Design a protein with these regions (language model features):
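Conserved beta-strand/loop subsegment of P-loop NTPase cores
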Residues: 203-210, 233-241, 265-270
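Conserved glycine(s) of the Walker
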Residues: 301
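Helix-rich effector regions associated with P-loop NTPase G domains
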Residues: 21, 28-88, 110-113, 150-161, ...
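Structural detector for short beta-strands of small beta-barrel domains
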Residues: 112-123
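A conserved segment at the C-terminal end of the G1
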Residues: 304-314
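Conserved Switch II/interswitch segment of TRAFAC-class P-loop GTPases
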Residues: 179-182, 203-220, 244-248
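Beta-strand/loop nucleic-acid-binding surfaces
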Residues: 135-152
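Canonical P-loop GTPase G-domain recognition
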Residues: 246-298
Length: 430
């Protein structure tokens, strides 16, 4: 124990002094100090053990020989093991895509081998492509190789219309061109300076799935999903699952907050796969010839909802941990499934734990149009709508023209976007 100035003592000498320098009044009993020190040491030991385990795993992976393309292909499911795979006719091709395909074929060698296709599934980097004549696995052409430094956003994604070459007598094809995307649902992920990842392309609507019955609905996640959907020109639909887990009062409270957050123009559907509630409403949001993407974190009930819409268990489902209601990843591939009857196609992707917003100003403006419109009358062009004089947005809030929950959410998202942009480029000042 070392006495510091005044009536405080400082504990140091641990593995990371800056993290464990604790200051408390001298009146604390000795047993309290011992408990605090023991807890700090245990936390440090746990961190060290976890870091060592991660380092050992990285070393093991570095020494193992990478799997060959043949080994990876052998590990993906065969077509005979898949159900509800969309046909080529389920995914319409627009005029711009067809014109781009014709132009590419006119310049390609052996154009008779080229086919117009749609990527309906992605397993371990191997797309499953549906064409007018067949459905088969394909690989990327050399021009798509990531080792050359291309952005991942250029790689074929689920929902892409592609020009694929398939030589006579070959089981696999080669994707040589990704045709223009009508819409593209992208997110930023990983790496120090970020990387764009296309989760699905050519989508018409996004089903924002959020579970009920686990405390308050995660409004921040719903808001981020709303911004991402509107940014890519897709129609957002909020789907609240597991309604059977909450009582009437909880449901009314959560519904009120969600409606306040998303505004009157966004549809909100309450569902329960166990009771069959709301399934027809969700199905009506995906008419024949359209494509919807289902978006939600692990444990939100995406796969369970899809199985209920399909009428049988096609996708694997998993439980959630009771202590924090967090789910485990059960969807490990990006897949499309065709709904039965007069309905369209739904794309499913692994649950996303984070939804960073970078460069989604257009989506933010579309999600909160009344705030953007009111901000045009603010005295200062860079008004943050928090403390500046002459803020027209706060005046509109006081007058009841802007919901306080929507304004608070808008401010949080705008601040998050500024921080994310500066992380990608420290020279950016917003």
């Amino acid at each position: 124990m070392k006495r510091a100035e005044g009536k405080y003592v400082s504990w140091s000498g641990f593995a990371r002094p800056a993290l464990f320098d604790l200051k408390y009044p001298l009146s604390c009993d000795l047993w309290c100090w011992e408990a605090l020190v023991g807890k700090a040491k245990a936390k440090a030991k746990k961190k060290t053990t976890g870091a060592r385990a991660k380092r050992d795993r990285r070393r093991k992976l570095a020494t193992e020989a990478p799997a060959s393309a043949e080994e990876l292909l052998a590990s993906v499911p065969g077509l005979d093991a898949l159900q509800d795979v969309p046909a080529f006719d389920d995914l319409p091709v627009d005029d711009a895509q067809r014109a781009a395909f014709d132009d590419f074929c006119a310049r390609a060698e052996e154009p008779e081998q080229m086919q117009l296709g749609a990527v309906v599934r992605l397993d371990r980097g191997f797309p499953l492509v549906a064409t007018a004549d067949d459905t088969f696995r394909a690989e990327h052409a050399v021009g798509f190789a990531k080792s050359r430094g291309e952005d991942e956003v250029l790689l074929p994604a689920v929902g892409d219309r592609v020009a694929v070459r398939r030589a006579p007598g070959h089981d696999m094809g080669v994707i040589e061109c990704v045709l223009p995307r009508r819409t593209s649902f992208e997110r930023w992920r990983g790496r120090a300076r970020g990387e764009r990842q296309v989760l699905c392309s050519n989508v018409d609507s996004v089903l924002i799935v959020q579970a009920l019955g686990a405390g308050e609905v995660l409004l921040d996640r719903v808001a981020r999903s709303l911004v991402l959907a509107l940014d890519c020109d897709a129609e957002p639909v909020v789907v609240l699952t597991k309604a059977d887990r909450c009582d009437a009062d909880e449901l009314e409270r959560d519904l009120d907050r969600v409606h306040r957050l998303v505004g009157p123009d966004v549809r909100v559907i309450v569902t329960s796969s166990a009771e069959g509630r709301g399934l027809d409403e969700v199905r009506a949001c995906v008419p024949a010839g359209s494509c919807a993407m289902i978006l939600g974190e692990s444990g939100a009930g995406k796969s369970t909802l899809l199985n209920a819409l399909l009428g049988h268990d096609t996708l694997a489902t998993g439980g959630v941990r009771e202590r924090d209601d967090q789910g485990r990843h059960t969807t490990v591939a990006r897949v499309m499934v065709a709904l039965p009857g007069e309905a369209g196609v739904i794309a499913d992707a692994p649950g996303l734990r984070s939804l960073p917003l970078v460069g989604h100003e257009r989506g933010l403006a579309r999600a909160f149009p009344e705030i953007v419109e009111a901000s045009r009358a603010c005295r200062f062009g860079d008004c943050t709508h928090t403390h500046e004089p002459g803020c027209a947005v706060r005046e509109a809030e006081d007058a009841g023209q802007i919901d306080s929950l929507r304004l608070e959410t808008f401010q949080n998202l705008a601040s998050s976007m500024r921080v994310s942009a500066q992380m990608l480029d420290p020279d950016v000042h917003l």
